[in-house]
Amino acid sequence: MRAPHLHLSAASGARALAKLLPLLMAQLWAAEAALLPQNDTRLDPEAYGSPCARGSQPWQVSLFNGLSFHCAGVLVDQSWVLTAAHCGNKPLWARVGDDHLLLLQGEQLRRTTRSVVHPKYHQGSGPILPRRTDEHDLMLLKLARPVVLGPRVRALQLPYRCAQPGDQCQVAGWGTTAARRVKYNKGLTCSSITILSPKECEVFYPGVVTNNMICAGLDRGQDPCQSDSGGPLVCDETLQGILSWGVYPCGSAQHPAVYTQICKYMSWINKVIRSN
């Protein structure tokens, strides 16, 4: 007697695929990340931040273009991730609550279905960093379905005031850790940085930084690098900036990083989220 055949409808097949796809993607990412070079052990690891405590950055998002790590981002709503506009508006995969490129530790995988770039953003070409002195460098990404909020995944609070010079803040990322060659950390690295005044920033980047940008850095060797583009600047557990651009060498205390200042864009962010 023949065993009965199982027939799957198109709908049930799609549901099964949707359940399997996140696991498959995670396995492929792990295989891809395993090929990334290890950190340079000749360098002082304390000079480039330290590993973030597990689950301490539940708003952190890694954005992938296929299997390639593309940019960082931050969860600002159950259905929305904020990142830098220069990361491009192609469909991406978002790993929300991610703190390790190799391990699955409670993050949630979502496809982005829509991108909303700030209407005044135009990729520029400045005198210091060609194509990296862009004003209004913000983009909101809508997730295919809302994330489930909990201890490992939660939205970062938007600012009720602007950060002030001297404020101590934190950045986290998987970015380059040495100027000699580009490489990624597998684990999320946290670094402490200080908000600079506009006058201090002008010394480093004369005539380049606008009132919609904010500089932070100067703590020894802890500036984030360009491969952390789109990552959050967090001050007192509120979002104050999105990493827009900086100057090589990575980890150089001589050049602060430049962020899009989130407090200047609250109306736009809230309008996009409410209307979509």
Curated annotation (Swiss-Prot):
Positions annotated as glycosylated: N39
CDD domains (UniProt xref): Tryp_SPc
Residue span, Peptidase S1 domain: 47-274
Signal peptide: 1-30
Residues annotated as the enzyme's active site: H86 (charge relay system), D137 (charge relay system), S229 (charge relay system)
E.C. numbers: 3.4.21.-
Cell compartments where the protein resides: Secreted
Top-rank taxon: Eukaryota
GO cellular component terms attached to this protein's record: extracellular region; extracellular space; secretory granule
Enzyme kind, highest EC tier: hydrolase
Keyword annotations: Cell cycle, Disulfide bond, Glycoprotein, Hydrolase, Protease, Secreted, Serine protease, Signal, Tumor suppressor
Molecular function via GO: serine-type endopeptidase activity; serine-type peptidase activity
The keyword Zinc appears for this protein: no
InterPro entries in the record: Peptidase_S1_PA, Peptidase_S1_PA_chymotrypsin, Peptidase_S1A, Trypsin_dom, TRYPSIN_HIS
Gene Ontology BP annotations: protein maturation; proteolysis
Tissue expression profile of the protein: Expressed in breast, ovary and prostate.
Disulfide bond sites: C52-C162, C71-C87, C169-C235, C201-C215, C225-C250
Cell cycle in keyword set: yes
Annotated family: Belongs to the peptidase S1 family. Kallikrein subfamily.
Entry function: Has a tumor-suppressor role for NES1 in breast and prostate cancer.
Official protein name in the record: Kallikrein-10
Organism in which the protein naturally occurs: Homo sapiens (Human)
Organism lineage string: Eukaryota, Metazoa, Chordata, Craniata, Vertebrata
